């Protein structure tokens, strides 16, 4: 096993075959999920009752096992979560990979000895994020994939300055999400399938059309504008080792055993200094699974390289180019490696003139049924089975190798290579004096629920006439444990000198000891002591105590005054429109979320004294290791308070003024809400947008509803990403240093296959947010929310002009005070919005509200 100073190779396992493949190819640790509470619900996953068997199998081979618990946990699931925590502890899981801070708190209460690793779903991009995870009890953190090598170096230095020794884990291979993990709401908003719940719908892999200033932009064959190439940091391993990264993680719990075997072996050999042929390794990895391999963000931001936009499905290595073809279906190729019958290839067809840009171009491919070698790196092939339509082919088209039976056979053998259990250590003690039997005692492991194992020789020790018993002879005979699964680790000897016992008797004693160990249940697969199982009432009591502490001892007292709005504006004209309203009493406070730092002081000056809770400022959702400067304009503006969105803002801004927490903090249960309030003194939090109406009401009933703020109207942020589409497709640059800032000159939307155009914005750090083109309104649920005791309702503006701003505020304010029925507001919103509005996450789904967790 690796320790903190030796990089760990961590491989994925979605089933037993993948788990065994990872171990066969040298993984130090494996991460996997059970049927609920993990971020890959589409994987086969394991059953909870198999957890003990999995861990015994791994531990017998010297491999660690990490259980993924990397989702948000809803209020009504906490009891089930507690049961899984206890089960993981019972099974001797080496660590839980977690996202939910409330779950961390529950784990510390129930299973304090179980290690916690902060998931990449925690969106950790800075030293403040690492420190927050440490405060929550994490012993390791998985960093966001968006950090470059230079960011990792800077982060390590910042952690040293804080004297925080936290092992860091980074992804080195596999699929890349275009959005920050833990911050993607696309599946939730468009299909009520939350990525924060393991149900990502892969909307980033779909085609989109860029609409610039109202006109569709012709991007030729670039349709997959949000689909990154896959990550392959094989060549960067030496530098990552030098940076002191503790664990290298391979993505792929949805992949098969051959992928896991090929990827694990490649990185194992690179870590061990055994790799010698980079081209062969790249082909090995491309055949495993590849949408095109890149270094992701590790070598710095290059938006044009990260997303090529031409395809989003699996393709293997490029093996040639098309030279010509004929009516009989023969394709003449210039090839980079010899092809064989039975292999699969694919070529791209040129789209027809006037073809729908949101319809993927045709692919021409199949199995090679016939092959003629033409010499000099040329061949001709016919594809099948059946007749292949070659319409749309173009000379010079690339040829990808998508399947290779020989590769599959080779890696199937590698994936199923047997791995014998390691011999586990035995500690023994022998005692003896002349004239008495020799005593043999098992020191470690100790049988549970049985007396210590001791046995005696059947004959007494005698005076030796030749060489007597000594440590060497005893170790030689008692250590003959080959094939038993045990090895002699230590032997304590308390013997008088020059004593004799027949070798046959020593051998008998060894065999008898092993038999008695088996009777006591001490087998190599169960050598670790079993932990006592806490009774169900103990678990229930611990959970009840946590929830009671989160709710607080004092009775809930409704806030004085009528429920009111908190309005979030994204422009100064919107702010000025609010100030000009005839009824300022409709609004409790305003949040200004402005891209330009130069506008912040102006916004504060305009809003000062206008509303009871004043004007608060909101910062970016992400702060990288070199971006502390982005917080300083917020500080210098001296607002009445802040809407905080990440750990850096919590650290920097909460000491300065009243703060509330935004949805990006991922508050889904009372324990998380209580953690943020007590740790940072937040006056309110906006719950995670992954909660539907019923789950939001559950949260309100389990805490003080005065601590919650509900967003009644918004354009849901779909993707929040480091990738900048303005730079990638509207400039010849690679990042913010040479892009020319097209984001300041153009209005951009992405049109999806249903015709909806989704607005795109860039923040101060050049990160892009794609908003849902259809607004979400929870106004129909307003009566239920008011009955639950909620009093603060956010209205988020996006690109409304001043007139639309005032009309929307007036409409929702009148709904709050009861002068307009909620159903009427919903109907008016359907009319006012060109695309109508959606209930989105604030829908009620009744008894099925917890999706697949309890299935």
Set out the residue ranges of the language-model regions.
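His/Asp/Glu-rich metal-coordinating catalytic cores
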Residues: 144
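Active-site pocket-lining/capping segments in soluble small-molecule metabolic enzymes
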Residues: 2-124, 128, 150-247, 254-398, ...
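Long, basic N-terminal domains or extensions that often function
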Residues: 139-140, 406
């Amino acid at each position: 096993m690796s320790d903190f100073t030796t990089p760990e190779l961590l491989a994925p396992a979605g089933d037993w075959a993948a788990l065994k493949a990872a171990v066969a190819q040298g993984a130090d640790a494996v991460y996997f999920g059970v049927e609920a509470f993990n971020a890959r619900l589409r994987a086969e996953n394991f059953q909870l009752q198999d957890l003990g068997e999995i861990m015994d199998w791994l531990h017998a081979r010297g491999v660690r096992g990490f259980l993924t618990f990397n989702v948000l946990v809803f209020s009504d699931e906490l009891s089930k979560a507690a049961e899984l925590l206890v089960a993981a502890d019972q099974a001797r899981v080496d660590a839980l990979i977690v996202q939910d801070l409330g779950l961390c708190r529950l784990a510390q209460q129930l299973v304090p000895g179980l290690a916690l690793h902060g998931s990449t779903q925690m969106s950790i991009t800075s030293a403040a994020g690492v420190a927050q995870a440490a405060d929550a009890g994490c012993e390791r953190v998985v960093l966001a994939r968006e950090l470059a090598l230079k960011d990792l170096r800077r982060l390590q230095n910042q952690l040293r300055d804080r004297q925080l020794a936290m092992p860091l884990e980074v992804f080195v291979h596999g699929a890349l999400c275009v959005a920050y993990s833990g911050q993607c709401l696309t599946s939730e908003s468009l299909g009520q399938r939350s990525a924060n719940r393991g149900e990502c719908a892969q909307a980033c892999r779909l085609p989109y059309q860029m609409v610039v200033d109202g006109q569709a932009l012709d991007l030729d064959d670039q349709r997959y504008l949000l689909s990154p190439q896959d990550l392959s940091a094989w060549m960067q391993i030496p530098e990552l080792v030098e940076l002191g990264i503790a664990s290298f993680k391979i993505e792929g719990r949805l992949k098969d055993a051959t992928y896991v075997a090929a990827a694990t072996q490649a990185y194992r050999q690179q870590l061990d200094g055994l790799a010698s042929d980079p081209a062969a390794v790249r082909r090995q990895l491309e055949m495993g699974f590849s949408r095109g391999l890149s270094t992701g963000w590790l070598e710095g931001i290059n938006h044009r390289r990260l997303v090529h936009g031409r395809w989003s499905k699996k393709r293997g290595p490029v093996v040639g180019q098309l030279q010509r073809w004929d009516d009989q279906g023969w394709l003449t190729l210039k090839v980079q490696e010899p092809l064989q019958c039975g292999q699969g290839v694919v070529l791209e067809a040129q789209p027809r003139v006037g073809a729908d840009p949101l319809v993927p171009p045709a692919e021409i491919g199949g199995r090679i049924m016939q092959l003629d070698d033409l010499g000099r790196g040329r061949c001709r092939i016919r594809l099948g089975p059946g007749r292949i339509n070659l319409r749309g082919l173009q000379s010079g088209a690339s040829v990808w190798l998508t399947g290779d039976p020989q590769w599959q056979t080779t890696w199937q053998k590698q994936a199923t290579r047997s791995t014998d259990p390691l011999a586990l250590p035995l500690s023994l003690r022998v005692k003896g004096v002349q004239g008495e039997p020799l005593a043999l005692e098992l020191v470690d492991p100790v049988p549970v629920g049985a007396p210590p194992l001791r046995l005696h020789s059947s004959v007494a020790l005698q005076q030796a006439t030749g060489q007597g018993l000594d440590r060497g002879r005893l170790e030689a005979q008692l250590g003959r444990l080959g094939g038993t699964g045990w090895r002699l680790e230590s032997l304590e000897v308390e013997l008088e000198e020059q004593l004799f016992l027949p070798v046959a008797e020593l051998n008998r004693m060894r065999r008898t000891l092993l038999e008695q160990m088996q009777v006591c249940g001490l087998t190599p697969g169960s050598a670790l002591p079993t932990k006592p199982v806490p009774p169900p009432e103990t678990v229930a009591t611990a959970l009840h105590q946590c929830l009671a502490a989160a709710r607080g001892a004092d009775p809930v007292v409704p806030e004085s005054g009528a429920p009111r709005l908190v309005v979030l504006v994204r422009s100064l004209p919107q702010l000025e429109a609010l100030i000009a309203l005839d009824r300022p009493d409709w609004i409790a406070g305003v949040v200004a979320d402005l891209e330009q730092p130069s506008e912040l002081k102006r916004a504060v000056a305009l809003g000062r004294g206008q509303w009871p809770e004043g004007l608060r400022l909101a910062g970016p959702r992400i702060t990288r290791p070199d971006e502390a400067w982005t917080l300083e304009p917020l500080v210098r503006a001296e607002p009445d308070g802040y809407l905080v969105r990440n750990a850096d803002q919590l650290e920097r801004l909460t000491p300065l003024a009243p703060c509330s927490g935004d949805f990006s903090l991922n508050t889904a249960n009372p324990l998380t809400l209580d953690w943020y309030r007590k740790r940072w003194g937040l006056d309110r939090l906006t719950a995670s947008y992954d909660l539907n109406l019923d789950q939001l009401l559950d949260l309100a009933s389990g805490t003080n509803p005065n601590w919650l703020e509900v967003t009644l109207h918004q354009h849901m942020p779909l993707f929040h990403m480091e990738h900048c589409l303005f730079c990638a497709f509207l400039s010849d640059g690679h990042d913010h240093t040479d892009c020319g800032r097209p984001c300041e000159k153009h209005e951009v939307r992405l049109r999806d296959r249903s015709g909806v155009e989704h607005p795109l914005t860039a923040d101060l750090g050049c990160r892009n947010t794609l908003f849902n083109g259809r607004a979400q309104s929870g106004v129909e649920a307003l009566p239920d929310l008011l009955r639950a005791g909620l009093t603060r309702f956010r209205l988020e503006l996006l690109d409304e002009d001043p007139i639309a701003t005032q009309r929307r505020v007036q409409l929702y304010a009148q709904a709050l005070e009861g002068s307009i029925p909620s159903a009427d507001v919903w109907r008016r919103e359907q009319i006012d919005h060109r695309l109508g509005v959606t209930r989105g996450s604030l829908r009620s789904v009744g008894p099925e509200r917890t999706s697949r967790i309890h299935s």
